[in-house]
Amino acid sequence: SSFGIYYKLPTYTSLGFKNTSGIFINKTNKYTKSEHIVTGFDYSVGAASKISIEGFIKKYSQYPISVLDGISLANKGADFEVLGNEEIITNGKGETYGLEFLFQQKLFNKFYGIFSYTYFHSKFSGLTGEYLPSVWDSRNLISFVGGYKLSRNWEISSRWRFLGETPFVPYNLEESLQSYPNMILDYSQLGSEKLENFNQLDIRVDKKWNREAFSFSFYFEILNILAQKVPVPKEYGLARDSQGVIINPISLFEVDIDRNTIIPSFGFSFDF
């Protein structure tokens, strides 16, 4: 078991933010405080394998809150955006707790691998004090990395990742229609909608040639070999006719995005 208290400096994007008068209004923000409690046990299965189970609790205080949106910064950031570049206050709270199972096998009988499963909750408070799910509150997280060593320096390996349904902030379509192309997020609906499960399997094959003076390695890899869709929030555009002309009165429609691409790649290295 272990216990620790940690402090984190506010992000530079928040400390460097200026209001319209050119004043650094976030420079007095407090350090984010987090208290961690971890307990568990592990058990060796033979000479090469180990099983471990851990429970954890993390308590956060003095967490930054967006003054404009009234929510914790932990409830933002699911998209590609700069966090903290706004006025914030540091009186938010949060908590994360869960249980993790881990199985690990070192190279034995030509096989090696690590499998882990984590079940957890994560929530943070905003200006109202109400706890809302963080953007990474997927509840279920599974990962596997393993491989099998064949003869003559061939190796096949795989990586599997599964992520449960993740909360996201939907758009306010009425306000977004008036401000398009700037889409307006509706933070009052945070937690009401979730993305689909994320599930991806990657496969890789390696071959290595060893000589006295040098070694040569080659690999071929396929990402998302099962062609699973990557879950993303809905995207919208202006409705158009068959000629591409915007239809009046203007309205928004959901844009279909290709999200299940299989990505092959290869590479090599030469060492001497």
Residue ranges: model-predicted function:
Residues 26-30, 50-112, 252-267:
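Outer membrane beta-barrel strand-and-loop segments of large Gram-negative receptors
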Residues 3, 124, 141-210:
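C-terminal beta-barrel architecture of Gram-negative outer-membrane proteins
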Residues 1-5, 41, 53-57, 115-119, ...:
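Transmembrane beta-barrel strands of outer-membrane/channel proteins
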Residues 57-59, 80-170:
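Gram-negative outer-membrane beta-barrel transporters
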Residues 2-37, 57-82, 159-182, 230-233:
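Surface-exposed extracellular loop regions of Gram-negative outer-membrane beta-barrel proteins
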Residues 61, 113, 162-181, 196-200, ...:
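C-terminal beta-signal and adjacent terminal beta-strands/loops
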